[in-house]
């Protein structure tokens, strides 16, 4: 065996390498892959050296027709493949041509998931090189439909399913996962999937999709990523009655049973993977999301993308839009439709940044921000009946029953939708915004597209082309009065991959609000005048890896500044360091 394990760096045998976790975008491979450059030979290890038919069935090492003649001979592949030798670039062109033949987005999603299951590097090569085209396929809005139909399209397990049946043995379940050095976990309980509600165990599509973006956009190694679904039941009657439903067929656990089960999950995660594993809470219902973040944000490297990631990306859009609107954050007035995780999270980060800029207490800067929920404007007279996370936004004002009246009374310069209620920004609402603003900033953030508060065409048309618009789901360019408007997408994918990479490369042990502000500032700086000329307040996704490297560097710098980083000494050039740590999907040559 030792004869096959050749020295790969500085004359050191791979058997003598220190098996510590790397500081880069993944876990350390003791058998050479993490140390090898793209032109060096690596050994395709699984439990043993993969060869023959098993190598073709191993998605991490399979290259399909790109195995050259020498590799086919050395790894017993002769006869198992047609004789032609392809390149990765040719494979990419062929697959993109095939995917473009599908008319139904869900078919494209399934084609991409099939590719991920058989050829991991080619999957990420496609996604990185065609990110603007494929991002809506592998994530929002298509992933929402995929989750709704997950039971029917389920083929091969991806990630860990931890249900109430595993109570008392969660550590054992975690140890069943084949990778030991996990750096990023995305976990959901499926109760609030996008704007689609309780999808129970079928919410697994969200962690899987998110982690594919951590790799493609942020450069975190796939083997360092772990998607997890916590199955505590579902209250979705259609799923409970569906014979194809893949989860527990019982109503959701709540209260003490739920909190104890989550505690039993969080403790062994830290025990098994260490203090520096990032745990991203995803699509938990409001009543649990805030409690979990408050409880575990001080004891774990925990992050809620719906609360913190959304807030960071929206703040970045607002900060960049100020170059079009003029003034500072404190010069503007904000009105939200939706006072859940996203709405209150965005509002709090805006208030925090405003407080930082003006040196005013956050209690004062919050007064520039108003929220509307299902019962109307959140005001002081409602304070006793409000959930705890809404109370900071209960300002003194007469009751206002609906959004239109709130716009007329508050006269905001920025209107933000995070309600999950499609078409909530009516013509009257947007016209009211246009009547009191030369350039109203309208952010319709709810996903998927069907739940968006308004479309790009509606925003531009009803404001006579004066709106600055961005949305949570993608919209096509709009022609109005001979001018083409390109709507921006306030997609969390701008933030969380770079944020995660920044936490990984710095070895951070906690997520601090200052890191979220640092991520926002880095993203806002990437918007160019050319982008503004097209009406964009976010940079194009085609540059996402460069954007993520700058975000990672800014986040890591803040971690070092706050004393929360453990990877010492601090690299001199954090941007270059982040880029060097990013996973490359280019095929490796096998010895």
From Swiss-Prot:
Q: Which domain of life is it from?
A: Eukaryota
> Which co-factors does it depend on?
Mg(2+); Mn(2+)
Q: What does the entry list as the binding residues for NAD(+)?
A: 192, 306, 447
What this protein catalyses is: (S)-malate + NADP(+) = pyruvate + CO2 + NADPH; oxaloacetate + H(+) = pyruvate + CO2
The protein's matches in Gene3D superfamilies, at most eight in alphabetical order, are given as: Malic enzyme, N-terminal domain, NAD(P)-binding Rossmann-like Domain
Keyword vocabulary terms for this entry: Cytoplasm, Metal-binding, NADP, Oxidoreductase
EC number assigned by the record: 1.1.1.40
Q: Which family does it belong to?
A: Belongs to the malic enzymes family.
What is the name of this protein?
NADP-dependent malic enzyme
């Amino acid at each position: 065996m030792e004869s096959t394990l050749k020295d790969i760096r500085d004359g050191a045998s791979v058997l003598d390498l220190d098996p510590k976790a790397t500081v880069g975008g993944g876990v350390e491979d003791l058998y050479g892959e993490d140390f090898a450059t793209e032109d060096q030979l690596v050994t395709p290890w699984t439990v043993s050296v993969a060869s023959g038919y098993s190598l073709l069935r191993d998605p991490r090492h399979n290259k399909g027709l790109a195995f050259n003649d020498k590799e086919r001979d050395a790894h017993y592949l002769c006869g198992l493949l047609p004789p032609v030798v392809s390149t990765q670039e040719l494979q990419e062109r062929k697959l993109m041509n095939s995917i473009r033949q599908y008319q139904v987005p869900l078919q494209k999603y399934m084609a991409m998931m099939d590719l991920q299951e058989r050829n991991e590097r080619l999957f990420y090569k496609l996604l990185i090189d065609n990110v603007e085209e494929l991002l809506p396929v592998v994530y929002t809005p298509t992933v929402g439909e995929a989750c709704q139909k997950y039971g029917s399209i389920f083929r091969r397990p991806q990630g860990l399913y931890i249900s109430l049946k595993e109570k008392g043995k969660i550590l054992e379940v975690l140890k069943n996962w084949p990778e030991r050095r996990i750096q990023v976990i995305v976990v959901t309980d499926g109760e609030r999937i996008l704007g689609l509600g309780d999808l129970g165990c079928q919410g697994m599509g969200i962690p899987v999709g998110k982690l594919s973006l951590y790799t493609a956009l942020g450069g975190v190694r796939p083997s360092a990523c772990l998607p997890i679904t916590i199955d505590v039941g579902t209250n979705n009657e259609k799923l409970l009655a569906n014979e194809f439903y893949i989860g527990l067929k019982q109503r959701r656990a709540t209260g003490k049973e739920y909190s104890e089960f989550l505690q039993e999950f969080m403790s062994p995660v830290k025990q098994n993977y260490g203090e520096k594993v990032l745990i991203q809470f995803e699509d938990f219902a409001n009543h649990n999301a805030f409690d979990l973040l408050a409880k575990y944000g001080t004891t774990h490297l925990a992050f809620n993308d719906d609360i913190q990631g959304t807030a960071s990306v929206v703040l970045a859009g607002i900060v960049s839009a100020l170059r079009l609107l003029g003034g500072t954050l404190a010069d503007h007035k904000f009105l939200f439709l939706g006072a859940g995780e996203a709405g209150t999270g965005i509002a709090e980060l805006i208030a925090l940044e405003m407080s930082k800029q003006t040196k005013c207490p956050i209690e004062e800067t919050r007064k520039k921000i108003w929220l509307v929920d299902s019962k109307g404007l959140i005001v002081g007279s409602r304070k006793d009946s409000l959930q705890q996370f809404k109370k900071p936004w209960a300002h003194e004002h007469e009751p206002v029953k609906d959004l239109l009246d709130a716009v007329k009374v508050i006269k905001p310069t920025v209107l933000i939708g995070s309600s999950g209620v499609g078409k909530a920004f009516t013509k009257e609402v947007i016209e009211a915004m246009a009547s009191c603003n030369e350039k109203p900033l309208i952010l319709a953030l709810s996903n998927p597209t069907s739940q968006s508060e308004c479309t790009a065409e509606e925003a531009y048309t009803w404001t006579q082309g004066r709106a600055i618009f961005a949305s949570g789901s993608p919209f096509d360019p709009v022609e109005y009065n001979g001018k083409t408007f390109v709507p921006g997408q306030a997609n969390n994918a701008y933030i969380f991959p770079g944020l995660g990479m920044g936490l990984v490369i710095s070895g951070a042990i906690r997520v601090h609000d200052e890191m979220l502000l640092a991520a926002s500032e880095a993203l806002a700086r990437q918007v160019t005048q050319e982008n503004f000329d097209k009406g964009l307040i976010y940079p194009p996704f085609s540059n996402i890896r460069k954007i993520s490297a700058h975000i990672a560097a800014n986040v890591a710098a803040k971690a070092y500044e706050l004393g929360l980083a453990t990877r010492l000494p601090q690299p001199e050039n954090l941007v270059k360091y982040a880029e060097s740590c990013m996973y490359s999907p280019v095929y490796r040559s096998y010895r």
